[in-house]
A protein has these predicted regions:
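Metal-centered catalytic cores of metalloenzymes
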Residues: 8, 17, 37-38, 62, ...
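Short glycine-/small-residue-rich Rossmann-like dinucleotide-binding loops
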Residues: 51-55, 76-77
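Well-formed, non-transmembrane alpha-helical positions, independent of function
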Residues: 10, 30, 63-66, 88
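Short glycine/serine/threonine-rich phosphate/pyrophosphate-binding segments
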Residues: 2-7, 28, 58-62, 80-82, ...
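A generic "binding-loop/recognition-motif" signal
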Residues: 24, 55-56
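Adenosine-phosphate binding glycine-rich loop
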Residues: 70-156
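Glycine-rich phosphate/diphosphate-binding loop of Rossmann-like nucleotide-binding domains
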Residues: 1-49
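Rossmann-fold NAD(P) dinucleotide-binding segment
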Residues: 40-47, 56-73, 84
């Protein structure tokens, strides 16, 4: 999708090795970047970060068994089939950064345009996302809970 494409391009242009998969294989044929590689099965691929950016509800009790990543951080909405999956991922040592945090940057960008907010205010709000992720990760470790549970208090 368009979100995944932009993310892959940014990461690859910064020198990261990016491995991508898409249901629509014709989209993969159009990729022309030496740091982007096409793979068939993203779920079992050994990687640092798995970034689902299109379909929701892709993580369920069955699909997470084959995951071979350290972090899940993607722009797809509602990636978990149900909220208990966040705890299952946590139990497996996989950090799941909830889509509500990741996608909040888009909402902040919209408010900048719609409400005529200045760059300083917008940048401050964007930095607050990173702060909340770090704070949530700390609380998640301290309370031995998923990041999704830890951030519930931080979102309000």
């Amino acid at each position: 999708g368009s979100v995944g494409k932009k993310l892959a391009e940014h990461l690859a242009n910064d020198g990261a090795k990016v491995f991508i998969s898409d249901i629509d294989k014709s989209k993969l044929e159009k990729i022309d970047n030496p740091n982007i590689y096409c793979i068939d099965d993203a779920f079992s691929f050994d990687c640092d970060v798995f970034s689902p950016c299109a379909l929701g509800a892709i993580f369920n009790k069955s699909s997470i068994k084959s995951l071979n990543c350290k972090i899940i951080a993607g722009g797809a909405n509602n990636q978990l089939q149900d909220s208990s999956i966040a705890n299952d991922l946590h139990d497996r040592g996989i950090i799941y950064i909830p889509d509500i945090l990741i996608n909040s940057g888009g909402a902040i960008g919209l408010t900048k345009d719609l409400m005529k907010r200045n760059e300083v205010e917008t940048e401050s709000d964007l930095m607050n996302i990173a702060y909340r992720v770090r704070k949530g990760l700390t609380e998640s470790q301290e309370k031995s809970t998923s990041l999704q549970d830890a951030i519930k208090e931080l979102i309000v």
